Amino acid sequence: MSIRATAATPGLLAYLRGINPAEHPALARLRERTAQHRMGKMAVAPEQAAVLAWLVRLTDAENYLEIGVFTGYSSTAVALALPEHGRVTACDINAAYTEYAREAWQEAGVAHKISLHLQPAIFTLDELLAAGRADSYDLAF
């Protein structure tokens, strides 16, 4: 299995690869590991995660909400792009899949930025609303 952007033309992919920084070593290892996973096709492509990271930098985002973590490629890429005080709220229901993510977050040195909620995202969203955090996110994916 390979992880690739399915809706991008070869020209667009070449452009994105040319303007984006090199893939972080922790992301490269996670991508390779995820590609071997039986559900590996669920992962975002490196170019998609790079666009998310670019949006973080472009908008000076500090708080990011992710619904559906899988093995953590996009959450790791975003956490790397966030400022040191930035935070990721990550929602998923599968502890086995997110174990890959936890390992990647540690390896990339961003685990301290990420709060993983292992329950249906609707419950986490309800909790965030009840805590008065309706307007606290700069970017969601």
Which residues does each PLM region occupy?
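A short alpha-helical cap/connector motif
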Residues: 1-141
